[in-house]
From Swiss-Prot:
Modified residues (Phosphothreonine): 184, 187
UniProt organism field: Rattus norvegicus (Rat)
Glycyl lysine isopeptide (Lys-Gly) (interchain with G-Cter in ubiquitin) cross-link, chain position(s): 72, 158, 209
Subunit structure and binding partners: Can form homodimer. Binds both upstream activators and downstream substrates in multimolecular complexes. Interacts with TAB1/MAP3K7IP1, TAB2/MAP3K7IP2 and TAB3/MAP3K7IP3. Identified in the TRIKA2 complex composed of MAP3K7/TAK1, TAB1/MAP3K7IP1 and TAB2/MAP3K7IP2. Interacts with PPM1L and PPM1B/PP2CB. Interaction with PP2A and PPP6C leads to its repressed activity. Interacts with TRAF6 and TAB1/MAP3K7IP1; during IL-1 signaling. Interacts with TAOK1 and TAOK2; interaction with TAOK2 interferes with MAP3K7 interaction with IKKA, thus preventing NF-kappa-B activation.
EC category: transferase
A biological process term (GO) from this entry: apoptotic signaling pathway
Region (Interaction with MAPK8IP1): 1-300
EC number: 2.7.11.25
Location of region: Disordered: 301-338, 354-391, 443-492
Protein topology in the membrane: Peripheral membrane protein
Compartments, as annotated in UniProt: Cytoplasm; Cell membrane
Alphabetical UniProt keywords: Apoptosis, ATP-binding, Cell membrane, Cytoplasm, Isopeptide bond, Kinase, Magnesium, Membrane, Metal-binding, Nucleotide-binding, Phosphoprotein, Serine/threonine-protein kinase, Stress response, Transcription, Transcription regulation, Transferase, Ubl conjugation
The protein, known as: Mitogen-activated protein kinase kinase kinase 7
Amino acid sequence: MSTASAASSSSSSSASEMIEAPSQVLNFEEIDYKEIEVEEVVGRGAFGVVCKAKWRAKDVAIKQIESESERKAFIVELRQLSRVNHPNIVKLYGACLNPVCLVMEYAEGGSLYNVLHGAEPLPYYTAAHAMSWCLQCSQGVAYLHSMQPKALIHRDLKPPNLLLVAGGTVLKICDFGTACDIQTHMTNNKGSAAWMAPEVFEGSNYSEKCDVFSWGIILWEVITRRKPFDEIGGPAFRIMWAVHNGTRPPLIKNLPKPIESLMTRCWSKDPSQRPSMEEIVKIMTHLMRYFPGADEPLQYPCQYSDEGQSNSATSTGSFMDIASTNTSNKSDTNMEQVPATNDTIKRLESKLLKNQAKQQSDSGRLSLGASRGSSVESLPPTSEGKRMSADMSEIEARIVATTAYTKPKRGHRKTASFGNILDVPEIVISGNGQPRRRSIQDLTVTGTEPGQVSSRSSSPSVRMITTSGPTSEKPARSLPWTPDDSTDTNGSDNSIPMAYLTLDHQLQPLAPCPNSKESMAVFEQHCKMAQEYMKVQTEIALLLQRKQELVAELDQDEKDQQNTSRLVQEHKKLLDENKSLSTYYQQCKKQLEVIRSQQQKRQGTS
């Protein structure tokens, strides 16, 4: 904070010059910093430190820059926030000029990332909450993409930049430090690798469709409650390389076909094949009819029982049938049902079964009983050995039930658009009696063609799974998503070098001239140097981490030595006291003997 104060303690005139760019007109309220009462630091954004504060008797979040290098990001966020006004975008109250900071709406629920993967205890949430969050995110981004005269690309959509308010029921987009006008078509790679569209880190010109790709990853993340590409690990360029080669998050067991189709379309390698954010809003709005309860506040567990729930973070009672989508290794291998480490989505309320049964009786098309596998009864927090999940399969059955007799609308739609989202396969529901944290899990869909399943060659958990259904001899589906057939994903030698893409924009090699051997040689040399640079930087990071560990161990050793020295001194002091007391005891004993002898002499003489 002292650095931020130093960086922003210049005169108000220089601060005004920094904010008032000649090519833009900013519409914001200038706030006197003396009116703000800072309470605590709550995190960081694309730039600067974010603090919770009081301003005019209400909670606000203030973002202060820490160095001169963050001024550009500050200008970008101030410019973009001053243009927007949407219920799903964080509100800008104004800005301070001395020190330079933004004053924004405060989100008491924290980020979506913390709700999904934060510290214990994690809240329970339903499929309705997950779908509602994605719908609200798409509505906010669609608003950005439709702005006039210049639309905006956020470029850094990810759960840490999505804030929750109103008990976790309302989502707001924040952190516009990397946003740009669509006309800008930036070519650097700001953002986060796990949610980043391939065209962004490949250095190509990109459009608003990069936000669509990020949205698709977020949809997968809120359904599975798992971090995307977490199994890859390592530096960011490892994830970039995998995404470039066609790897996508594994498909989800029992996920209804409409949601799966929308999600995989967003992952398309070709941006033109991805749906627009406006189309996503229409699809999600249509699907939300089958997910009631999104307006109910999130519930946090009051306590954990001693038997199996005290450490819910490691609970692996549920399984998701997922498949790797590394398209460079296609095979006929079915993936094992991988345990979900974050099983936290609560079951739908029991009233859904009543609504479903009523709709089925009205339509006359379906007759599905409330079996144990598809039960949606709410269980109390103290129940043990019960399965707590939101079975997406019954949601799909309700979609079929409510639309089987619906008159189709006029007009036509493109293939794989939401016009044919009701083409649903058979649902297989599995059961498990282990206690665990709740999630949308066990989403297995059957009835697809064999030979379409690929697996990551390094996966340690591969086994064959078959179905017992009498109507099909095909194996249970664990189908990965693959990009267009025309996409080169076999890792050939002509793949672009990816190491330099993780460098800062100014350090990346310029594109060579293909007709010049000298230019190509310089480019290849620069790429090799960039790869070596990244290797050295990684080693430095590991060594620094090891240094910190050794420093911590050294500090602990010093503390242990100090404790040992203190104990030795205390022991020596106690020995001295014992010796002194022993001497005093002997003296007292001698004095007692003298007194007794004197008394005996007196008695003898008397």
